[in-house]
Amino acid sequence: MSQSTLLFQIEPASRAQDQFIQQKIDLKTKPPGALGLLEPLALQIARIQGPKQLEIVNPTMLVFAGDHGIAAEGVSIAPSEVTRQMVQNFAHGGAAINVFCRQLGFNLEVIDCGILTPVEGVEGIIDQRLGAGTGAIHLEPAMSLACVDKGFAMAQALIERHHQAGCNLVAFGEMGIGNTSSAAAIMAAIMQLDVADCVGRGTGISSETLERKQMLIELALLLHQSAMTGPKQVLACLGGFEIVQMTGAMLAAAERKMLVVVDGFIATAAALVAVTINAHVRDYLIFAHRSEEQGHQRMLEHLKAKPLLSLGLRLGEGTGAALALPLIQAAVNFYNQMASFSDAGIEAVV
C-alpha cells in the first residue's frame, strides 16, 4: 500500500447498536418498513453518528472539474472548451447545480482540478490544478502515480477544512467533457467487464460516436493492462484529475465519519475506486440517484447500493446529489421526531 493511502485511517461504521437503532425505527407509529428506503438510510446515519440524535450540519456540495485528453477524439457532444465555460457558469451562479444548491441550502464550492485553461479573475473557484487536462488514455497514461498522490493530498486538505468548519455531510458533483469515457474505462478495469457493458451515450452522443468511444476505451484498456496492478494505478492510467480528487475526498470524508452523498455515473466511478482502496468507505456512502448512463446500474449493484431517486438525470454537476438532500433530512427528522407507539398511546403493529 502506498504512503498516500496509508494516510486514510478509516474505521467501519459501528454496528454495535444496530438492534437498538432498528427497534427505535420499528417502534415509530407506522408499520415496519413503511417508510421504505428512508428506514435503512436512518439506520446507516445512526451507525455513523450514534443512535441518540441525528443531524445534518453545513451540507456542502463539492463540484470537481477537469479536462480529458480523450475528448479531442470527439467522444462527447461538446468540445473541451465547454468545461471551462461551465466552470465560469458555476462561478456566476447560473448552472442547474447553483439553482438547486440555493433552493436546498447547500454550500457550493467549485474546484478546478485541471481544466485546459484556468479561469482567471473570477471569485469562487478553488485552484487545485494537477495539470492542463489529462493525457489521452488510448495513447498514454492519464497522469503519473505522483499526480494521483498529489490529488489525494489536496482532496484530504479540502475535506479537513470543511470538517473543521463543522460540515458533516459532503456531496460530490463533477464537470469534465469526456469524463464518462474515463469513468467507463475505470469501471471496466476494476469490475473486469466488457467495455460494451460500461460505455453509454453520456450527454447524448450518436450511435457512430458511441462505437468510436467504445473502441478508444478498449484500446486504452489494452494499452495499460499490465500497468493497472491496483486501484491507484487504474486512476493513473485511466482517470481524470476530477475523478482522482473525488476519490481522495471520499476517502478523507469517510475517515472523518462524514456522510458522503454520491451523484451519478462519474461520481460512482470515483466511489468504486475509493471502496476498492478501502472497503470501509462503503459504510459512509449514500447513493443519490440512478442515472440514465449505461453501466451505472451495474456499478450500483456491485456496490450493493439502492439509490434514493430515479429521475432520468444525465447532467452531472452533482444535481442528483443535491436533490437527494431533502430525503436524507427526512430520514434524520423521522428518526428524531416521530413518536413511538407508546408515546402516542397507540397499539403497536410490530
UniProtKB/Swiss-Prot annotation:
Keywords per UniProt: Cobalamin biosynthesis, Glycosyltransferase, Transferase
Cross-referenced Pfam families: DBI_PRT
Pathway noted in the entry: Nucleoside biosynthesis; alpha-ribazole biosynthesis; alpha-ribazole from 5,6-dimethylbenzimidazole: step 1/2
Question: A single Gene Ontology molecular function, please?
Answer: nicotinate-nucleotide-dimethylbenzimidazole phosphoribosyltransferase activity
Q: What class of enzyme is it?
A: transferase
Q: What is its EC number?
A: 2.4.2.21
Reactions catalysed, semicolon-separated, are: 5,6-dimethylbenzimidazole + nicotinate beta-D-ribonucleotide = alpha-ribazole 5'-phosphate + nicotinate + H(+)
Q: Which domain of life is it from?
A: Bacteria
Q: Which family does it belong to?
A: Belongs to the CobT family.
Q: What is this protein called?
A: Nicotinate-nucleotide--dimethylbenzimidazole phosphoribosyltransferase
Q: Which organism is it from?
A: Shewanella sp. (strain MR-4)
What's the encoding gene here? cobT
